[in-house]
From Swiss-Prot:
Name of the gene: SUB2
Motif DECD box per UniProt: ranges: 206-209
GO cellular component: spliceosomal complex
Swiss-Prot/TrEMBL catalytic activity: ATP + H2O = ADP + phosphate + H(+)
Protein name (record): ATP-dependent RNA helicase SUB2
Function: ATP-binding RNA helicase involved in transcription elongation and required for the export of mRNA out of the nucleus. SUB2 also plays a role in pre-mRNA splicing and spliceosome assembly. May be involved in rDNA and telomeric silencing, and maintenance of genome integrity.
GO molecular function: ATP binding; ATP hydrolysis activity; RNA binding; RNA helicase activity
């Protein structure tokens, strides 16, 4: 990192409590003596092993408990089990957990639990790197606050009419209590004094590594951060959190609880079958059609490396009687959201996308991810294939390898995540290995 970048960081305390959550760590903490646990429980960022049997053990507001039941959730995931008991009490959090384990629900439930809505005051700010992700997070807030009619939530991101945001924020009765936004748009609203963040109590960054690794976006975040009170809860979440980015995250945190679910080398998803297919570039279309014909799937997402390839492949699929839609960063925002919504609502089973859908997007029916083009780096592979097999369910990921560069990326993926990705068998794979019964 450059010296200039280091100087641009906020100077906050680096004092933190780190928790490595795996089976062994959980057992050790759960068996600690009562005296030490009682002592630690008063310390912000401390950790006591908790084995909750259900969401009811978190003693959430009745309105939240009803919404959770409506969603069909009974038992918290590992990351929820270890994080929610402290996050609902205002502890700062730095959390890394693999894709699909319910990180979003951690901060949505925690902030709603703490929220005491006051008309005209913004209490919660959630930042993320992608517009579709912001839209999705807003919908999660709507889902879990369905029995909290006084709570108002809004989403702000670039590519939409700035005046509409200003109009919403100009009237006390329409000012949202919860804001989900991309940094650029919210920075503009803060800069132009259209929004007052002086009452913010919870500040969340989802996909924090992606948000903070780019210097321009980090500076936007810092400007927004400075507009909020110093005394607030800060929570950060991501599926990948490199050793290099962690100190940058900690600059925003005060004595945080750090949760790392599983060793970083084991971040690939349980229940996700992963294969590769070696072939020439010109063979990809024929092989893709064969896979779509032969495999059983609910919905599939196909990743390509460019907007042009996304558009061309979608045309080809539709012409070949495979109804598909495409989503990429070069289309108008309204169109992107409309297509995302159509895919999520199962209007189409096939989506061709660039990496704009490679992070955080949660569509429950996706159980097949295909890398038509390989990503450039190992971490992006994890985020891509994590679209299948969400929340511990089964799924299938297939990567097409057509160059030496692809082979090098595949080798890095296997080394980085300590996983063996095998060649796709000629006879195919048993659907029971990747379909939930």
């Amino acid at each position: 990192m450059s010296h200039e970048a280091e100087e641009d960081l906020l100077e906050y305390s680096d004092n933190e409590q780190e928790v490595q959550v795996d089976n062994k760590a959980t057992e050790v903490n759960a068996e600690g003596n009562g005296e030490s646990q009682a002592k630690d429980s008063d310390k912000k960022g401390s950790y006591v092993g908790i084995h909750s049997t259900g969401f009811k053990d978190f003693l959430l507001k009745p309105e939240l408990s009803r919404a959770i039941i409506d969603c069909g959730f009974e038992h918290p995931s590992e990351v929820q089990q270890h994080t929610i008991p402290q996050s609902i009490h205002g502890t700062d959090v730095l959390c890394q957990a693999k894709s699909g384990l319910g990180k979003t629900a951690v901060f949505v439930l925690s902030t709603l639990q703490q929220l005491d809505p006051v008309q005209g005051e913004v209490s919660v700010v959630v930042l993320c790197n992608a517009r579709e992700l912001a839209y999705q997070i807003r919908n999660e807030y709507l889902r879990f606050s369905k029995y909290m009619p006084d709570v108002k939530t809004a989403v702000f991101y670039g590519g939409t009419e700035y005046k509409n945001d200003i109009d919403l924020l100009s009237k006390k009765e329409t000012v949202p209590h919860i804001i989900v936004a991309t940094p650029g748009r919210l920075k503009a609203l803060v800069r132009d004094k259209h929004i007052d963040l002086s009452h913010v109590k919870n500040f969340v960054i989802d996909e924090c590594d992606k948000v903070l690794e780019e210097l321009d976006m980090r500076r936007d975040v810092q400007d927004i951060f400075r507009a909020t009170p110093r005394d607030k809860q800060v929570m950060m979440f991501s599926a990948t959190l490199s050793q290099e980015i962690r100190p940058i995250c900690r600059r925003f945190l005060q004595n945080p609880l750090e949760i790392f679910v599983d060793d970083e080398a084991k971040l690939t998803l349980h229940g996700l079958q992963q294969y590769y297919i070696k072939l020439n570039e010109k063979e990809k279309n024929r092989k893709l059609a064969q896979l779509l014909d032969d495999l059983e799937f609910n919905q599939v997402i196909i990743f390509v490396k460019s907007t042009v390839r996304a558009n061309e492949l979608t045309k080809l699929l539709n012409a070949s009687n495979f109804p598909a839609i495409t989503v990429h960063g070069h289309m108008k925002q309204e169109e992107r959201i409309a297509r995302y919504k159509a895919f999520k609502e199962f209007e189409k089973r096939i989506c061709v996308s660039t990496d704009v859908f490679g992070r955080g997007i949660d569509i429950e029916r996706i159980n097949l991810a295909i890398n038509y083009d390989m990503p450039n780096e190992a971490d992006q592979y994890l985020h891509r294939v994590g679209r299948a097999g969400r929340f511990g369910t089964k799924g299938l990921a297939i990567s097409m390898i057509s160059s030496e560069d692809d082979e090098q990326v595949l080798a890095k993926i296997q080394e980085r995540f300590d996983v063996k990705i095998t060649e796709f068998p000629e006879e195919g794979v048993d659907p029971s290995t990747y379909l939930n019964t």
